[in-house]
Amino acid sequence: IILTASNEAQAEVYRSQIEYRLQNHRLPADTHYAVLPDPEGKRVGSGGATFNVMRYIAQQEGTDVGNPFKGKRILVIHSGGDSKRVPQYSVCGKLFSPVPRELPDGRGSTLFDEFVIGMSGVPSRIREGMLILSGDVLLLFNPLQIDAMFNGAAAISIKESVTTGKNHGVFLNDGHDQVSLFLHKQSEEHLREMGAVNEHSCV
């Protein structure tokens, strides 16, 4: 499990949260955990943070390995944003902000805890690969519905109204269940022009 952070200070908070959970047996001890701040203290966004994760994985394996990702199942949670809308969580980041749910042991849950629980069924569905999540959106799905028989990259998406979708990322289907275009935070008009909106006004 790899978390990304915007800077070293945020990364230290994330590391302390993970260490606390490990010491209290609230995370699997045989899983490797890493927290990677944006390189050189410069904000690189989710794309740059993903490349940073890939570099980290390659460096862990050394230069002799042909494919450093072979046989690995990696969960990346991008969590390097500032908590501007909820500044009370800017220190610990949105990822460790509480959610209105009590865990079986009686403690309050956080987005991070929900991600770990929700994604725990994914490794059994894939032999190897990397699942990338946005740390401020709790996406719940049934891992049994994942079709892991693919090459390259795959995306998990949900149908949503265009009024919601225009504020997020929208995949344009090529008609054969492949992504032909990714439209990020586009106007409703542009989404309609591109053919991304169906007859029910959903994307």
PLM region descriptions:
Residues 1-203:
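Unchanged
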